[in-house]
Amino acid sequence: MKALLASLLESSLNSFQKLSLTHCYAIKCGSISDIYVSNRILDSYIKFGFLGYANMLFDEMPKRDSVSWNTMISGYTSCGKLEDAWCLFTCMKRSGSDVDGYSFSRLLKGIASVKRFDLGEQVHGLVIKGGYECNVYVGSSLVDMYAKCERVEDAFEAFKEISEPNSVSWNALIAGFVQVRDIKTAFWLLGLMEMKAAVTMDAGTFAPLLTLLDDPMFCNLLKQVHAKVLKLGLQHEITICNAMISSYADCGSVSDAKRVFDGLGGSKDLISWNSMIAGFSKHELKESAFELFIQMQRHWVETDIYTYTGLLSACSGEEHQIFGKSLHGMVIKKGLEQVTSATNALISMYIQFPTGTMEDALSLFESLKSKDLISWNSIITGFAQKGLSEDAVKFFSYLRSSEIKVDDYAFSALLRSCSDLATLQLGQQIHALATKSGFVSNEFVISSLIVMYSKCGIIESARKCFQQISSKHSTVAWNAMILGYAQHGLGQVSLDLFSQMCNQNVKLDHVTFTAILTACSHTGLIQEGLELLNLMEPVYKIQPRMEHYAAAVDLLGRAGLVNKAKELIESMPLNPDPMVLKTFLGVCRACGEIEMATQVANHLLEIEPEDHFTYVSLSHMYSDLKKWEEKASVKKMMKERGVKKVPGWSWIEIRNQVKAFNAEDRSNPLCQDIYMMIKDLTQEMQWLDSDNGVDADSLHA
């Protein structure tokens, strides 16, 4: 009879219905009283995830042994019900059943999953009392528990108590030091493990270590790890390869990531595809990301939420709007529109569209039922980026009144709005709120405060914020301070700060050079600026981007060196983008190089026929030259092409209220009196400065 039941249970492993029938048969024939049979059925219920049925059977069992108790404890911990598992463990001890190594291991696994260090210490005491601290399975579980609770010193002590640590013990300890990002100790342990002939390194050893190597400075170390993986013949382990794809992409070596990806052949899983797409997107290789997605479709690879979030982050340019909207349709078709991370990615995508408005992003935000902090931060940042600073402030207030706790990112976005509005009083209030909320030492909040005070004209307060930062190696804070001095015409101070940055080994990035080139441009430090541009790649290992060339063109233009600016553009390794050309157009116009300006403008109209900037620049240039027919021709062209000038807005803070207005705004009921006052002020300014030869056309209210 026992053999028949064993056979029936074996055939029930993949069918809950068969398991139920086998259970009924065991009751009917009286075999359910056999503890072996009961334990087998109990274990099967647990494996199917039917904890309720398992619990009823456990309560009805006339006899229970340690296997019965351990099976139920394992079931509760697997379902995340640690309190029930702990209660059952206590009952097990009281019942007189033997608590063994398996009991401790299963309980410690549950404690590790929820990081209940307090319970872990109690169990450790019982382990010592029971004499199991040298047991490799219990010891490994203790190491894992302490490691996941980020108590790596305790994990190391527990590890040293194990008489013969195995791969699981070593992997748990290494993973603990990975979790606290102690790269030095983690790799030291890897070296020790490598010297142990009896211990085998596997995917559990390398996969966590690879997650640490997420910066270009670790590229050589990553290649060493890759060599070890090849030496051990683990190059086809999917977990290791997926981690390696992500690490190579994070280190900036996308070609190596693609090589690992291609080496997987037909054994790629969904994580492999998603990791490669994310790597391409991160490094602005958008077309490669889209092509890989198309390959996924050809290979009938099922997509998931991570596929779409990786792709949506690449749909930021105007040329990718159609593809981005198609992805939006796929997200809806998949039924993922109420998945918060998917909607957050869609909100960010619509915000980043250059010609887009906030309407689509706001509609998505409002339709999302379970908004998280990223949702709020995205919409606040979107308003700030689009210049809708009042809306950013309003939504920050809504966030504060919700149950979600405000973080440093929200404060940074709001302070950016204050910077754009140049509302000092509001900025100071947010500064006080950030201090009260404990974010005043955060590098991103500090950087935003530096920008805000700089734009509000209080460079001394910006400097005080910079001096208060806890991390003296914060690149974003140094960049903000350099740019702040640049905006105040203190180029030499910016250069001194740049030198300090280099001497203190603060990491330089693209923004650093944009800031320092801007500083040189604003203060006429031509030689210094050009020298820095030329040294970027050979000395600082940073390849110049379009924004750096645009800053250098502006630098030469401000000095009246139009031909030098033209030569610089012609010597660029890549074709100049619209940003560089628009900068050069401004230079030509300011220096009176009308013919050259017209050529640049015509080229811009070919590549960006819908952008209003070029039309407006041409119109103003012809107006300055009093060429009214040409100006009328530009206006006509705009009308025919449906191009409208985006009005520029200005703000002023009066009695704690922000007033917004644009050029020739007549919506204010007092506009007649306002324009009369402007006229009187303009006439008075002309009269006062007539001796200095100030051109009336240069006076703007």
Curated annotation (Swiss-Prot):
InterPro entries: E_motif, Pentatricopeptide_rpt, PPR_At4g14850-like_plant, TPR-like_helical_dom_sf
GO molecular function: RNA binding
Keywords: Repeat
GO biological process: RNA modification
Swiss-Prot/TrEMBL PPR repeat ranges: 34-64, 65-99, 100-134, 135-165, 166-200, 202-236, 237-267, 269-303, 304-338, 339-371, 372-406, 407-441, 442-472, 474-508, 509-539, 545-575
Database matches in Pfam families: E_motif (PF20431), PPR (PF01535), PPR_2 (PF13041)
Chain residue ranges for the region called Type E motif: 580-655
Chain positions covered by the region annotation Type E(+) motif: 656-686
PANTHER family xrefs: OS07G0578800 PROTEIN-RELATED, OS08G0340900 PROTEIN
Family: Belongs to the PPR family. PCMP-E subfamily.
Name of the featured protein: Putative pentatricopeptide repeat-containing protein At3g25970
UniProt gene name: PCMP-E46
